[in-house]
């Protein structure tokens, strides 16, 4: 279960960035896949999770780490999402990976909507 700071950070970030993520249309597929890849890396690299969530580390430094790792390759929206997340407070370092994964799911649903297959996704999820 996530702590209060993590729940708030996840919810506020997703609420604020949802319109921008939705507006990426079919690029949301790429963004979602990038976010799932980042989730996997975070889940397997505790040091990176800590580096990106350390409250004593300046946000600009955290964003610098992100740009070094994914900046040139990632979709600009992926970098914007990650930059927003590293600027927020987390109850535990591991919670940022959960938030990244939540964004990945959101991105895939926005892609499904842009591709006109939202109903099919809903049916598939119920089966």
What do these predicted regions represent?
Residues 1-127:
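Elongated, mostly alpha-helical coiled-coil "stalk/stator" tethers of large membrane protein machines
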């Amino acid at each position: 279960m996530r702590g209060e700071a993590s729940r708030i950070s996840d919810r506020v970030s997703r609420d604020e960035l949802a319109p921008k993520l939705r507006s990426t249309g079919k690029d949301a597929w790429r963004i979602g896949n990038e976010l799932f890849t980042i989730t996997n890396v975070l889940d397997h690299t505790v040091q990176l999770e800590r580096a990106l969530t350390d409250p004593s580390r300046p946000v600009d430094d955290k964003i610098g780490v992100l740009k070094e790792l994914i900046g040139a390759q990632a979709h600009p929206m992926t970098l914007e999402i990650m930059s927003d997340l590293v600027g927020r407070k987390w109850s535990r370092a591991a919670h940022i990976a959960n938030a990244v994964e939540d964004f990945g799911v959101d991105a895939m649903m926005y892609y499904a909507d842009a591709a006109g297959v939202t109903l099919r996704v809903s049916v598939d999820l119920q089966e």
